[in-house]
Amino acid sequence: MDGVAYLIKMKYKTDKIGQNISSEEKRKIYVSERALTRTEYFKAGQNGMNPRIMLTTAAVNYSGESVIEYENMRYGIYRTYHKFDSDEIELYLHKQAGT
């Protein structure tokens, strides 16, 4: 693993007057950056995604988060892939509005 990323989980609490207050919980993980294939880029683009990066990390690091921070940029995680014979998971990232 040659880089660091932060998986971001949103947490919500209700305050005294019933308003939902959101907060973020960041968790540091080690990742490796991989190139997106042309096929992945094309298929994601067909579905309205703006694919940017694919990262790999140990599968135990990922708990269903949908936002990640990598190299001071926020991305949405639009797809994951976990090979049955590997302890790594692939995280496919896209730039989305609001991240």
Regions found by a protein language model. Name each.
Residues 1-20:
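Active-site-proximal polar cores
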Residues 19-99:
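Short, conserved turn/kink motifs that form compact alpha/beta structural patches or helix kinks used as
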